[in-house]
Amino acid sequence: GFAYSDIIARYKRMKGYNVCFPAGFHASGLPAVSLAKKVERKDEGILNYLRQNGCPEDVIKKLSDPLEVVKYFSRVYVNEYWKRFGFFIDYTRLMDTISPGYKKFIQWQFYKLKEKGLLTQKPHYAPFCPNCGPVAVDKSETDISEGGDAEILEFTVIKFDFDGYILPAATLRPETIFGVTNMWVNPDVEYAIVKVGNEKWIISKEGAKKISNQIEGVEIIDSISGKELVGKKCVVPLVGREVPILPASFADPNVATGIVMSVPAHAPYDYIALKDIKADIEPIVIIEVEGYKIPAKEIVEKMGIKSQKEEEALEDATQKLYKEEFHKGILNENCMEYAGIKISEIKDAVKDDLIAKGNATIMREFSKKVVCRCGESVIIKIVPDQWFIRYSDEELTEMSKEHVESMNIFPAEYKEELPKVLDWFGDRACIRKGKWLGTEFPFKKNWIIEPISDSTLYPAYYIISKYVNEGELDAKEMDNEFFDYVFLGKGKAKNNLWEKIRNEFLYWYPVDVNLGGKEHKTVHFPVFIMNHVAIMEWKHWPKGIFVNWWITQKSGEKISKSKGGAEPIPNAAMKYGVDTMRLYYAHIASPFADIEWDDEAVEQYKKRLYKIYELQEELLKRKGGKKDIDAWLKASFNEEVRKIIEAMEKYELRRAANSIYFDIYNKFQWYIKRGGENASLIKNLLKKWICMMAPFTPHIAEEIWEKMGGDGFVSNALFPEEEEIDKDALDKEALLMKTIDDISEIIKVTKIKPSRIYIYTSPRWKWEVAKKSHELHKEGKLDMSTLMKEMMKDEEMKKHSNIPKYAQKLTKEIKKGGKHPHIDEFEYIDNAKDFISQEFNAQVFVYKGDDDAPDPGKRKELAEPLR
């Protein structure tokens, strides 16, 4: 992302814009705290990581302090990454999110949100680390090291009576309770007996730990072996049916309550498990689906599943059956008052009924394992009075969606997705309690604003950070009145500095483009927009977003410090060169596709830059004068400039890089091959080429620029402008290239090595037909009847019986975009015959189609304009 940002910033600067490219450190949250804890307990993994990345032993000792972690990595990023890569960052604006001034800035935002009624309190089931407290679980993985894409699932915990106890079975499909035939427990598990209010539950110890964080007054009072439960009976609520308790190793104590209800008519896992233990239990069908009698039985048999060990096949069967039942299923007479209701319409009716009658409650669990940065498993815990930002506010959502329509968003697909994301985006819990780095919440002591909520308006603070860094502004001066004036224009300036900062804010804002990884599509970017819309004046709402995809490992996982598996960037920069890596990032794939790190591919980009360097040295040695080929080089170069500018304006960096580092290189190679040696033209175009390289590979560009005697730094030069393109010059050389390709193809097919080559240009009558066809096409009158009438006006044309056949063919081609024949092809090919002769080591003869010329291959009559 930084490489893309830098390329865009450099390009815009070379196009004459003033560019502000600031950078900072998002130090809020758990990452620094977690790393410090690992250093404190001498975790070998983190110590080895630090040493591998060049951290001195005396510095490692200090990193048990989270603030030292922030300081150290801030220095590393600036010196080992950003400066080494030549990023065009304004270092006077560096800031971090735990500085006193930034904290004041964030608190001001929350005062504004509260003023607008966009803060609220309500109970919240939050991801919680037993060591670190509340954490955010999202794709940015700011606080966690595993499970960023986990969802919070809402299980219905149904209470089955068992000898004065409750067997709580957790399910995502409470409507299937009518088909329960038995219960599953794991005979090898020691279950806890837990007091929950006035009830005694039998639940896995892991489940007890989870439920105690979601329901008040949970107390473990005893334990019981799963073996003791097997063979006994419990009662299904609502229907009052007694069912047996059976053994199952798949009853995982780590999943929900560790107790599983069995619905073998509709759950392939349950059906095959009963078969495995040879239980004499008849499935109870509760859902009618066209084509099925006992759905689970039939899909298992159809897929040939024989055992519980076929987990992948069972999961596939489960998903297929669930999909069919959801879309086509209707509850039958076994479902009491719910009979006749479609599965797709049942929603929460059964769940609500069970809860209302005291037969069920709710339990929340992650869809997959989530691990905190500290290494502890994350659970879900109730926060009774959690504060939220009300992103569900209808007016805010609609205004944000409307603004998205006016934004420049890349890729285009994300612009289409974003309004839907904003519709879906609900209230966000915005504070946490724990050992966090961040800003104190102004309305509740000892609580910290969470990392996403403190990084929504952050670009605005870069305007202020410069004055803090230069010692002109102190955090003590930054009260709400200060921020109101600087960002909203409210009130009066207390001094000249306030006015100066306000004017600078008005000059730079709004943000033209905010770049970030794809993990922020549903995390950061929605709140970035909504907080601007909520707080800032409309003229300061952001203009653009650029989403970049990831550099991945072979496994497809994002390469990151927390994931490991990546060669340290400073080492890779030493090995390949930073310009090589910049070009690799920009060209190996679209910014909107994941890139799998490939050492061999990176090496090829290193060689490409070396080839360009060598070619430019060779070009500078040429001291000749003008030749026909000069016009083509200038025209084709100008054509590439047009393509590059068009691509850069759309942030299509790969397309621009392809033109700069491959297409232009090939054109200069062809120019040399054609004998081009115009020193003045070469120097002029080389300077432009280097200017276009500068945003992508600034170091090699500066080196060649200096070698050529360019004025100052190439980064301060202007980007080449579009110039008129000589289409005749392009068409002439394209004809020559096509002629050479055609000859090569004939030689390849015939396997004949020629000593003489005859080239014929089109006869005059074909040129006349072609010219008249294009004239009529331009006037919108081209058809066979009109064309033939026009041609027959010329007595000379009447002599050629093949005109109708050729005219018919040409009419079709022109309507498809055929080229207008406006060049003297004979003269150009004849002038190039020595070059063609050298290419094929043969004598070359060029004749006009009307000439009385030798025609040993009987090919002359086939000649047509431009082919």
Predicted regions: what they are:
Residues 1-35, 106, 169-172, 176-177, ...:
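N-terminal catalytic cores of NTP/NDP-binding nucleotidyl/phosphoryl-transfer enzymes
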Residues 7, 37-178, 231-235, 241-243, ...:
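Residue patterns forming the tRNA-binding/recognition surfaces of aminoacyl-tRNA synthetases
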Residues 10-18, 39-49, 84-89, 116-121, ...:
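Secondary-structure transition/capping motifs at alpha-helix termini
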Residues 26, 140-145, 627-645, 658-662, ...:
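Acidic, turn-prone loop/beta-hairpin segments
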Residues 115, 119-142, 203-221, 693-704:
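Amphipathic alpha-helical
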Residues 159, 170, 240-244, 248-253, ...:
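Alpha-helical recognition segments enriched in aromatics with Gly/Pro capping
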Residues 174-183, 189-259:
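Protease-associated
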Residues 599, 603, 712-867:
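C-terminal low-complexity, glycine/proline- and small-hydrophobic-enriched intrinsically disordered tails
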